[in-house]
Amino acid sequence: RELFGVIGLGYVGLPLALTFAEAGVGVLGFDIDDAKVERLGAGKSYIRQIPDSRIAAAVAAGGLAATTDYDRLSEVGAVAICVPTPLDGHRQPDLSYVMATAREIAARLRPGQLVILESTTYPGTTREELLPVLEGGSGLEVGRDFQLAFSPEREDPGNKHFNTRTIPKVLGGVTDDCLRAALEWYEPVFDRVVPVSGPEVAELTKIFENTFRGVNIALVNELKILCLKMGIDVYEVIEAANTKPFGFMAFWPGPGLGGHCIPIDPFYLTYKAHEYEMSTRFIELAGEINSGMPRLVVERVGEALNSHEKPLKGSRVLVLGIAYKPDIDDMRESPAVPVIEGLLARGALVDYHDPYIPAMPPTRQTELRLESV
């Protein structure tokens, strides 16, 4: 069988590539990062929760190879796009990575190939943004010459109960033939594939999942603030409420949202809603509450020091953990970053300790350059 291509070998693309390879499908991965390609070729991982042994086994079996050369797209029968979809400086969707990748594919697209977008995005992206670039750049027609579908990534780094293969895979094709072609590739690999009527449904499914979580976290964060003022233990309240066997789902307060999905995805939905002259006030309010939590943490640190007759300015503060969740090395959108920046802005002397992140890597989020103590 033809190779399966994966463009973008990060926290989404690499697990997807390994899942196909371990199912017996040959995979050719593409990434612009020479260091990643070299490590994969040597059987080494660069993501903590993916051990070297998985990479080495896939490479040794001939099931996984990686390259920086887009001209090798001619070797694959299907290609999944797994590139970042961040927000720009104005908190608007940034599809530049997706569109740049689409142009690279379009210049090399051949009849019979399948293109699948896996990057999280707003409803309409596959049909309204990706499709015109692919058809215009290749001269081919979707559904006749090539196939196009959307299947949202649902990665949860560090989850010990679910992995890429066992998480149900939602899949929507631009045409019926597109869906059938995508199912032929995905059904032998994943435990369960959930076909839907089109890419818009699949796109909104992912956005809704993460908006649901973000809104509920905002609710419990607001409850946390109220409980602080009332002198009530919010954790005891949640634990007691969680004894109800129906109609309640526990969410827990925290210093803010982290990861690439939950802090970002609701803004993709509100952006699209504005096209329909609708203001998603509930979602936007949740975003305001969650984005304000790091400031609350800084204020609480200052209050704690004041209770011991110490000012925040000049005090040494140690931040324990800077990843966005436990036991991973991923600090994308981590609330630890604005917490550290807020403490520094008020004159604190800040260090951090994280066994999985020895030094803060360059990110779009911050210019901080600290090393773990």
Which role does the model predict for each range below?
Residues 1-373:
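Structural/interface elements that position substrates and couple domains in central-metabolism enzymes
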